[in-house]
UniProtKB/Swiss-Prot annotation:
InterPro entries: PBP/GOBP, PBP_GOBP_sf. This is Short form salivary protein D7S. SUPFAM superfamilies: Insect pheromone/odorant-binding proteins. One of its GO terms (cellular component) is extracellular region. It comes from the Eukaryota. Belongs to the PBP/GOBP family. Residues 1-18 form the signal peptide. It is found in: Secreted. GO terms for molecular function: odorant binding. The keyword Disulfide bond applies. Disulfide bonds join 33-67, 47-155, 109-125.
Length: 161
């Protein structure tokens, strides 16, 4: 019988995802990066993208994350990750004594992936640090252009103001 073997194959197949729990990053709206989101993407997925809670390593997601990282100043012109820009954000958010821990966490994670320009892998490594959401939320608070207004918001209006 083919049906039981197909059912078993489906049950054993587990898609790989990067996020199982919310990061705690508030929704942000970066206008140039919105063009990277396919117009057919539903509101829930757009909400997750804007919170950097991206699960699948697709071309759309890579393009969006790469754009966000460029806007943050985390990628240089060659697409390489700028660790100093990340540390600068940590310092501005009040985490001045975490440089070594942040860099060790990032470098250790990237060692598993090997050298790669893949923005999704960089996102995975950057978000390993538990304080990264606080850093990004602090940066969002400093830049009012990154706060979506009620028309642009996909995640609800409770966290907008």
């Amino acid at each position: 019988m083919k049906f039981p073997s197909i059912l078993l194959a489906i049950l054993l197949f587990k898609p790989i995802t990067a996020r199982f729990t919310p990061l705690g990053i508030d929704e942000f709206y970066i206008k140039p990066c919105e063009r990277k989101i396919v117009y057919t993407t539903d509101k829930h997925d757009k909400c997750l993208m804007r919170r950097l809670e991206i699960e699948m390593d697709t071309g759309e997601n890579q393009g969006y994350v790469k754009c966000v990282f460029k806007e943050f100043g985390y990628l240089n012109g060659e697409g390489q990750f700028n660790k100093q820009a990340l540390l600068k954000d940590y310092h501005q958010a009040g985490f001045k004594n975490k440089d070594k821990a942040v860099l060790e966490s990032y470098d250790g994670c990237m060692k598993n992936y090997g050298p790669t320009p893949n923005a999704m892998k960089i996102l995975d490594c950057v978000t390993k640090d538990k304080d990264f959401p606080k850093v990004i939320n602090a940066r969002r608070e400093r830049n009012s252009d990154w706060k979506p207004d009620w028309i642009q918001a996909y995640c609800g209006v409770t966290k907008l103001f």
